[in-house]
From Swiss-Prot:
CDD domains: F-box_SF. SUPFAM superfamilies: F-box domain (SSF81383). Residues 16-63 form the F-box domain. This is Putative F-box protein At4g17565. Signal peptide: none annotated. Coiled coil: none annotated. The lineage of its organism: Eukaryota, Viridiplantae, Streptophyta, Embryophyta, Tracheophyta. It comes from Arabidopsis thaliana (Mouse-ear cress). Pfam families: Beta-prop_KIB1-4 (PF03478), F-box (PF00646). InterPro entries: F-box-like_dom_sf, F-box_BR-signaling, F-box_dom, KIB1-4_b-propeller. It comes from the Eukaryota.
Amino acid sequence: MDQSDKNPNRRLRVIPKWSELCPDLLRSIFEQLSFTNLNRAKLVCRSWNSASRGCVPKRNQIPWMILFPQKSENNSSNNCVLFVPDDNDKVYKTRDLGVDFAQSICLATYGSWLLMFNHLRNLYILNPLTLERIDLPHSTSINPNMCYPNFKYYRSACLWINNITKDYLVVWPIYNKCFFTKKGDDTWRFAPACHIRMKDQIIYNHKDHKVYQYASYGFIYVWDFSSDIPHVDKHLPAVSFISGREIGDKNKYYRISHQMVMSLSGEVVVVKIMHYYDLSRWRFRIFELNPLTQRWVKVDSLGDAAIILDMGITVVAKDIPGIKKNSIYFSGLNHPLTDPECRFVYDLTTGTMEPLPQCVLSSMLFSDSRWFLPGFTS
């Protein structure tokens, strides 16, 4: 018998460590992975992360939730928690992102990107998955003496970014003025024609370069951002059935609010949100504009689609594990930010709320959260 067969370490020498696998072999495996699984693989070790560069995963179609930390002795302010719905029993903690999230506010999301505003009045775009960061012109270029509102309650802004070229557009209303900046700008530009208030919701449709504004009393204005000087394009009929007032009905008190969403066909729909304070219950109604009558009519079902309210988008949800069709993904928006009952998936078929798993809510003391859709493009 060969004496080498008696050596107990012989097998250890011929079997390589998983962290030392050939990069070409790793890449051939990574290219077969879904977006979610590829991002998991990147976190295994440095060599896997390096080998994954350049790999294009299958397009992600599942909304994720990111939870931002509270300022606490037990919390790290530089890490966030990620929840992926097809991993119902676990959460993921991001690497140190070099950002003090406890003193920052997420104003908007687009794909994997977050539009952040910190206590130093800096705005920047951050990708928590790739660690990429794009610093925007400092807000003092708008007005160095401006007194800023509490953005925990006034988060009217919209973000669009191209994942490859990193071209971007950020539209940011401050009080009764509207400012915007694009890739290559070294300052914020004033849009004098756009009368957008910080309480007004705005969404951006890159396909037609239009910003849609939901203003007071249900008016919807459309602004054209295809040129360097934005201008009003048109306005849609008033959504008269929605208001933002408090309503009392005997012992039941609830608040009506609204959000605009882009449909799969590129049309604006309006989501009516009703919050019953005494019952901790929420209800949602969806309305679309009838092009013939120019009236808003109720939509009974989304069919095989779902709404991600934080992003103002509708996505396909047919036969996709991890996303629920005919549902609305909701994270509370401007409601009490740390209330776990404000984060759920609303089933339009049954009119019920599906809460987040306990592992998500107990993962950290959070100050805010957002649904986002890694890999999304429009």
